[in-house]
Amino acid sequence: MTNPELRGGSFLIIGFGREGRSVLDHIQSLYPNARIGIADQGVPEDRPAGVELFTGANYLASASLFDTIIRSPGVSIRAIKPHLSESSHLTSATNIFFAECPGIIVGVTGTKGKSTTSSLAAAILSEVFGDVRLVGNIGAPMLNHLQGATADTIFVVELSSFQLEDLRFSPHVSILLNIAPEHLDYHGGFEPYCAAKANIARHQLASAILITHEENQLLRDITSECAAMRHHFNERLSASSTTYVTDGTIVIDQGGYRTPIARTNDLPIIGPGNLQNSLAAITCAVALGGTIEQIQQGLRNFKPLEHRLEFVATRHEISFYNDSLATIPDALMNALVALGDEVETVIAGGFDRGVDMTPLGPAFAASKVKNLLLFPTTGQKIWDAAIAAQPQREYTRVDVHTMSEAVQAAYDLTSPGKICLMSPASSSFSVFTDYRDRGEQFKDAVKRLAPQKKL
């Protein structure tokens, strides 16, 4: 088999993490005699045999020496382009996968909710189809899952803006959930970030399907030239949405024939953001021919994901929730709405990507939050937003530098019967390896707390 994204006789893999290793295995299986290089700032612990290695500060300069350059998602196109020759072909594992995939691809993206929506869509579609594979940003590298796939295989692919930025294909079914400012340092601003997200629909044919929120004007604008059939979802009664909510019931509309699916408070995930995620996943199943019974069974079988409004434990009658994947203000705001007036303590803050924190002020003002436990560097911005929105309000502020310190402060300050929410509204990289590390440290610290405080 040949792949049009793998051109010439030499291949350079830029970035040798989990996805880079998957690309190496894939290329070697297709072209066992090819010249292959690996370029990475660091030296791989287990250097593969038979490949050239380029490391150090100038590792990208090696790009001009190869026919095809495969970048990992974390390496920006802007950084690579100055090092390409005129004949270089720059691609990615995502492009390679799309060019080679024999099955039906359901692509999911959005600033927030894509992991939950992808997982829920896969759970529901598994009740409809025999071979459903959840891959991409959420699971194992997508190239690992091509083996044994057929035209009937359904791939549910979570796609980040990094993966979409240079994508030359679009899924058969594209779900575009929402867009809010994120990764602005990587993309160079909000407009190029939106353009990257819009790539999920840019190459769709008239036979394809695009699923978006009916009332999201930004999504309408950036997909205005998309040729695909459109399906919408809405949290309100709507005559033009495939899936909508009325009187607390999710309803699907199939050509004017309306059928209730589930009560919103019976869903396995909570909060307004997760309601939208559920509606999008249900709409996808409807568009692909799922029955009412299959959709309902998929909803019943779904297990909520870690680090997304995850209940951890109760200590001294304080409920601790882990929302570590909340890396933007919108996510924290949704969490406050989802958990309601019982939230008394919020742990927030982290790496500063230049995202505006001022929307958090009104959200805190509308809440019953009393204690703000803040990590650098966005902790100060979050505090400023809270005070600017309600200067007379007396919050207790604690600046923290470790998760153990934050959890102990929450334990000391939060009233019995109330909630401590760890929802950072920021990236994790200033203190933690990633959002998983941050969430695991939170859970570990909570579980070490005494069940009851000593009198």
Task: List PLM regions with ranges.
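N-terminal leader/targeting and accessory segments in enzymes
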Residues: 1-92, 392, 449
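Nucleotide phosphate-binding/pyrophosphate-handling subdomain across enzymes
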Residues: 2-10, 20-26, 131, 263-369
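Residues in the short beta-alpha loop(s) of Rossmann-like NAD(P)-binding domains
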Residues: 17, 42, 138, 216, ...
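Phosphate-binding loop of NTP-binding sites
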Residues: 28, 60-66, 73, 77-214, ...
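Short internal beta-strands
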Residues: 36-41, 210-214, 345-348, 368-377
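Beta-strand->loop->alpha-helix junctions that form or flank phosphate-binding loops
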Residues: 37-40, 56-57, 91-96, 227-245, ...
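C-terminal helical cap/extension that packs against the catalytic core
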Residues: 47, 358-418, 454
